[in-house]
Structures are given as structure tokens and as C-alpha cells.
């Protein structure tokens, strides 16, 4: 493919659409798929992304020229273009020939827009992989045809499903090195399905044999594998149905900001997480439980009659209510649990292990609070998907942890709602993110409000929390 042809792709699409504005409007109307590539070390993840960008004409002339020079200088593919260099951006990655950080790339076809997360294969960078997977709808699991299903393949499959990804594409790469033999592909497919029986049952799994280096079954059907009658990888990406039924879920609107541009306007800004919010709808403010009615739904482009999940809006209520960042708007007839305790699946990202009794700052749906590790139930053995007793969680470990919270929180399970069920764990001294939490189970007892304390008790509590924060004393007033 010539550089000129690649360079003219967008210009040709603009001409077809009838101008720049029409082209931009068409781009906005396209559906978006977020997916990640993951697998074991050197399975060809970066090469696959480079091939997708190359064969869908997303590489410009200057990029191609740089790629040709870099391929000759530090490439690993001989006379061929080393497409992995398109996405391995860090100097350390290029020198070692591996992926360390999560590299994001963007491209589009006539049917869909895509955001790709190229995630690390090395076990010590599993935390980076979990970060990349948290916003994706689909995982491409690369398997080296020479090696078959590896431990990292199982690890990444488990993390993907743990983070709510239900669409998996198992791409058996480097088929060219195995002479494109069908029995190799079939054996790997069988081995993976044997393992996948331990994963959630509602998965949509596709298998495709590919060669990322030569482009077999990436964008065009391979002539070297006539025995494969399925779609290409790009066909799967363009047609997979990843529509989340967020609009059919319960209403969840986390308040991120109170908007007061003047004395006559008071609105509550944020992104609608799930459900449909309509003008005139009765809503309940959590955790106070006060009900009101939606008077306006304000956006940059004007008022709306209703809002759908993913839209950034400002809600104006009929009544003057004390609402602050971290509060939640739900349907008036919804009974949402407010709790101080939850069972959380934790992906630990710090070199210092997570231990029982540890205090952490937490963030959930715009709300900042504090939590304490009451008990570590178990650590997951990713290789065999079994549970083992643990007194701590080391770096890159995944385990089930019982948390208590300083104040009552509004939580859903992560599988129901990733916004109100996802917790960011932050070290209280360094302010560094040390883990990701996914709410598995909410304690059934409902918080009934703060008990009465004397003025002396309240003043002593404030004094201790102000001057001795490392003691981890909770706010007796529940954060109010």
C-alpha cells in the first residue's frame, strides 16, 4: 500500500461525505468500540495493532517514512516493516522489544470507531493491563501458535471477565511459523475452551487464526488458510454487538460538581451512569433520601427532554436541596442500599502488600471517603482459578477483601454498574493509587443514620482526625 494512498484516505472520505462538516457529523454518528489486546510476552500484540492501523490506511506518509527507518535501525523483522514500532512508544519498550505501558491508539472504518489499548504481557505489569481493561468492551487474547495457552493468557482472561468484559476474541497468532496447520489451531481452541469452562458462562467467545506480521485474517481473508471459514478479525470488531443495556438499568446519576454561575441558577453536573433521566421525573437524592422533581436537563447545546447513559448534563431540580459532590440521584421509587461494609475484589498495584487493618482513602463515583481492610478472605490463584488463604495481597495479586467505610456509601455491585461499583484505592500518606476495587457484595444491613454524640465527643473526634490522621479515626457524623 503506497503512502500516498494512505494519505488520501481521509480526503477521499471527506469528498464522499460532501464536505468537512458532513464528514465530522458522520464520524460522530458512528458507534464506538473500546477493545484491548493482551496475552503472553512477545505474542505479537503491538504488531497486531500496527497491522490494523496499516491495513485500514491509518498511517500517514511521515509515519511510514519514520517506521521504515526505525525498522532498519532497531527492527526485529529483517527486511519487513516492524509494525510493532508504531505503538511501542517508550524508549525502554523499543530497546527491550516489549510493551510496558498501556498504549492507546485510535482508528476508524466506514462502520465503526475504535479505541485500542495495547496492554503489557509481562506479569509485573499486570496492574497496567487491569487499568487498560477497565474501560473496554472487548478483549483480544493473543496466543502464540507455537506455545499454546499460557499462564498469562489465563490471567488476562480472568482479569477481563472480572472487569465485566463479556466479548473475547482468541486470536491464534504466528500461524505462518506453524505452516498454517489446522490441527494446531483446533488444539489451541480446545485447550482454551477447557479453561474457559471455569469463567463466567455468559461469555461471547470468537476464535480466529492469524498472522499479524503478514496480515493473514486481520483485514482480509487469508489465502494460506482455506480451511478457515469464519470472519476476519476486523469483521468481528466491526459487527460484534457491545451495546450495554445501561438505559434499561436503574437510574444512577453521580453528582460531580454543583454549578452556580449566578444567584438565579443552581444545577448539579455529572455524567449519567445508567438509566434514562427525563424532564419532570421524580428523583431521590442519596444518601439524604429527599425527593424532588427534575425541572431542567441542561447541556452545552441546549436543554433536553431526556438524557441517556454517557451524556454529560446539568440537572436543575424543582426544590432547593443541600446536594454536594459525591451525592447520587436515583429514581424516587428506588430503594438503594446505603452501607458501611462491602466485599470487594481487589487488584493490588503497589509494591507494599495490602494487609489486614490497613486504612486507605477511597474514591467511588465522585465520592471521596476512607476505608479499612477488615479481612482478606482469599487470594485468587490465576493459573488454576482456585482460592488460597492469604494474610496479605502482594503486587499484581487479586483477592477478595472485606472493607468497612468511614461513612455510609451508595454502592452497587460492579457487574451491575461499574461507576457505582468501582472503587479506587489510594494510599493516605503518598496519595498514590495503590489498587482497584470491584464491589462483589454489599452487606445487607442498612445504615440507619448517625447516633447521638455529646459535644465533647464530637470535639475530641475532630481534634484527633485533624492532628492524628494516621490513627484512622472515622468521622462520627458520617462525613457531614
UniProtKB/Swiss-Prot annotation:
Domain of life: Bacteria
Pathway linked to the protein: Sulfur metabolism; hydrogen sulfide biosynthesis; sulfite from sulfate: step 1/3
G4: annotated span: 173-176
The keyword Thylakoid belongs to this UniProt entry's keyword annotation: no
The EC number(s) this enzyme carries: 2.7.7.4
Region (G2): 97-101
Region named G5: 211-213
InterPro entries for this protein: CysN_GTP-bd (IPR041757), CysN_II (IPR044138), CysN_NoDQ_III (IPR044139), EFTu-like_2 (IPR004161), G_TR_CS (IPR031157), GTP-eEF1A_C (IPR054696), P-loop_NTPase (IPR027417), Small_GTP-bd (IPR005225)
Region annotation G3: where it falls in the sequence: 118-121
Alphabetized CDD domains for the sequence: CysN_ATPS, CysN_NodQ_II, CysN_NoDQ_III
A Pfam family hit: GTP_EFTU_D2
Keyword Transmembrane helix among UniProt keywords: no
Region (G1): 39-46
UniProt keyword terms in alphabetical order: ATP-binding, GTP-binding, Nucleotide-binding, Nucleotidyltransferase, Transferase
GO function term, MF aspect, one: GTP binding
Residues at which GTP binds: 39-46, 118-122, 173-176
Catalytic activity: sulfate + ATP + H(+) = adenosine 5'-phosphosulfate + diphosphate
Annotated tr-type G domain residues: 30-248
BP GO annotations: hydrogen sulfide biosynthetic process; sulfate assimilation
Oligomer status and interactors: Heterodimer composed of CysD, the smaller subunit, and CysN.
Family note: Belongs to the TRAFAC class translation factor GTPase superfamily. Classic translation factor GTPase family. CysN/NodQ subfamily.
Biological function: With CysD forms the ATP sulfurylase (ATPS) that catalyzes the adenylation of sulfate producing adenosine 5'-phosphosulfate (APS) and diphosphate, the first enzymatic step in sulfur assimilation pathway. APS synthesis involves the formation of a high-energy phosphoric-sulfuric acid anhydride bond driven by GTP hydrolysis by CysN coupled to ATP hydrolysis by CysD.
The protein's name: Sulfate adenylyltransferase subunit 1
Lineage: Bacteria, Pseudomonadati, Pseudomonadota, Gammaproteobacteria, Enterobacterales
Gene behind the chain: cysN
